[in-house]
């Protein structure tokens, strides 16, 4: 790919990731009207995120292998077509089960995005520019989530939640043609030195022999538990506990996600490329510090009294900004320790673990905890009915899982920082523990 085409390629992939997370998080802004229409518990609401995420995780590995061996461009275009069309069809459902089935299909399409796109970017940009490029790509997470909340909440209040799902599907009509016009780089095109070529082990086992990968996988599960729990229930928390309307909650959550997420991602990208020149563990160590800062900020934000929405939003979203630094820093670290030919497979393994062990539990366990705490609050008050006031108490108390796991995330990242320098050196040394470099 010619250097003049790099900005356009990155811009289109960035736009794909925006739509990816717009459509993935759209239900977060719509949970309250959906709950009331279908008479659902928070556990059932959490399952709308958890069950599709399990399928997403399982689909990611074969799609990652396909991205390493076939056309990433065609795979991405097909994924966009599938997830966008099924998001729109979700606006036609008449039952909770039909909505769940539509979301299962959405997540299968989305499973093609991250392994193929991050592998593509890894082949576009050399190591010294890769952190910024991946950070720009991952800005699609907060921007997509922010747009989803800011547009879908007011749209649902004006026209109903079904219309908001149809709106979410429309940008795909422009993105798919733009994606198909890109030139896909050759695998390993950005490398300035040839990685190790010898290993008898299959790629999956070679990847899992890298000590740092286990800490990265653990960190991925922890960060995704937090961020998916937050994405699912934050607007509902603002509505129930702080008294905002569905439209207000969506708008202010969207603004917070955009400002904090963009700031965190931009800082991570610039800092990650700078610190790697000074110390090989710099990216992992920086991510650990960011998670450590996020924990008390989230704790104080959740502890704000009912009605104190402004302070709560500000503190929790600043914490989110620090957590969002994870992507630009850690995704680049993954590329530092594996060979180009197995990048998509590596990302698929990583996503399998982080979504199956993290994101899949975030919405469901937070929802179950919320239901349990709401029942306890009602029982303590002598009420046989779990009304809206007790649901607000239950969800508020369940949110405390986020700062606790942010602290655990910092520990996992720090542990990974202790092993990454040796793994980066080992990548370029032939031998039984080197990651396979497949013949192209």
Where are these regions (language model features)?
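Structural signature of the two symmetry-related core transmembrane helices
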Residues: 74-88, 282-298
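Extracytoplasmic gate region of multi-pass secondary transporters
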Residues: 27-28, 210-266, 323-327, 331, ...
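Helix-loop-helix hairpin linking two adjacent transmembrane segments in secondary transporters
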Residues: 137-184
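Conserved MFS/SLC helix-loop-helix module at the cytosolic interface between two early adjacent transmembrane helices
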Residues: 58-94
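Symmetry-related core transmembrane helices of the 12-TM Major Facilitator Superfamily/SLC fold
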Residues: 163-180, 397-415
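Juxtamembrane intracellular "pre-TM" segments in multi-pass secondary transporters
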Residues: 2, 186-217, 241, 435
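Helix-breaking motifs and short loop linkers at transmembrane-helix boundaries and internal kinks
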Residues: 39, 71, 92-98, 126, ...
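Cytoplasmic helix-loop-helix junction between adjacent transmembrane helices
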Residues: 102-142
